[in-house]
């Protein structure tokens, strides 16, 4: 596979689509970042939003297999940076629909600088400000050898500008070690102090720490009132997508990066626990 770099993952995706003249419909999860949808539409593709699978919170696999014959591309997102190998699903899609293009969006995962092979046509990682490893910008991609790649000038969309970004592997690995260590310190606090019943499984806790509570907005407001950042996930882009909508309604993303200290993480748990049986 070819190693690609750009200022943003959306730029890598856009270049890939335009240079290879890819058109048609894209299947993508309903909780996708809206910037990705903008990129796809700007490249001239249409989109179909698919609900999430309850057991892994990624795009619903049976729905993808049912709709794939009407699509030219599937964009698979590793929800909340879940570190799991979905290659068997990709191979199943490819076996039933050989012509479909597969983009493996791992932008919330820990970047890998040594991807030698994948059943996906394009694998994306990001090192932007809100991602797992924050280098202040930049993206890494791996492209199957059969595809072409080149820079495409974009005049109208600031999300896709051609800013120069150079990959520094040494800097990336140094950052990764420090980031992982800090995240684990904060995650240890969250795991120990918060009820296990409201925590998502560990596979979803690398990028941020996720909990599910019935009074999401009140908890977020209480945290922010003390200067502790917290977010809810993206809303579903299709109201019929129940699992994605439920995550938007009940999930809270607790920060575990350099923005937060261990003292703040402890205080966040105290605030959440103060809601008592409501959480």
Spans of model-derived segments:
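Active-site C-terminal subdomain of aminotransferase-like
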Residues: 143-181
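Conserved glycine-rich beta-strand-loop-beta hairpin in the small C-terminal domain of fold type I
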Residues: 170-173, 177-191, 198-212
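Proline-centric
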Residues: 251-263
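Conserved PLP cofactor-binding pocket of PLP-dependent enzymes
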Residues: 216-252, 276-279
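Phosphate-binding glycine-rich loop
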Residues: 1-25, 33-42, 49-51
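Short beta-strand->loop structural element characteristic of the AMP-binding/adenylate-forming
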Residues: 46-55, 231
């Amino acid at each position: 596979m070819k190693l690609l770099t750009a200022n943003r993952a959306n730029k890598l995706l856009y270049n890939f689509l335009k240079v290879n003249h890819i058109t048609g419909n894209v299947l993508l999860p309903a909780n996708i970042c809206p910037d990705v949808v903008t990129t796809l539409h700007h490249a001239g593709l249409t989109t179909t939003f698919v609900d999430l699978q309850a057991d892994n919170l990624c795009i619903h696999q049976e729905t993808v297999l049912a709709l794939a014959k009407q699509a030219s591309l599937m964009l698979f997102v590793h929800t909340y940076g879940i570190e799991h190998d979905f290659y068997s699903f990709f191979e199943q899609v490819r076996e039933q629909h050989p012509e479909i293009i597969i983009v493996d969006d791992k932008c919330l995962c820990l970047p890998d600088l040594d991807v030698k092979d994948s059943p996906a046509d394009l694998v994306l990682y990001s090192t932007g400000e809100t991602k797992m490893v924050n280098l202040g910008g930049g993206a890494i991609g791996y492209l199957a050898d059969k595809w072409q790649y080149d820079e495409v000038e974009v005049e109208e969309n600031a999300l896709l500008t051609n800013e120069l970004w150079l990959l520094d592997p040494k800097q990336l690995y140094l950052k990764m070690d420090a980031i992982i260590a800090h995240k684990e310190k904060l995650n240890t606090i969250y795991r120990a102090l918060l009820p296990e019943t409201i925590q998502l499984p560990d596979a979803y806790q690398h990028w941020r720490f996720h909990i599910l509570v019935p009074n999401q907005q009140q908890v977020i407001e209480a945290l922010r009132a003390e200067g502790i950042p917290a977010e809810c996930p993206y809303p579903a882009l299709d109201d019929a997508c129940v699992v994605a909508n439920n995550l938007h309604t009940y999930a809270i993303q607790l920060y575990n990066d350099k923005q937060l200290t261990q003292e703040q993480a402890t205080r966040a748990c105290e605030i959440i626990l103060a809601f008592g049986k409501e959480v």
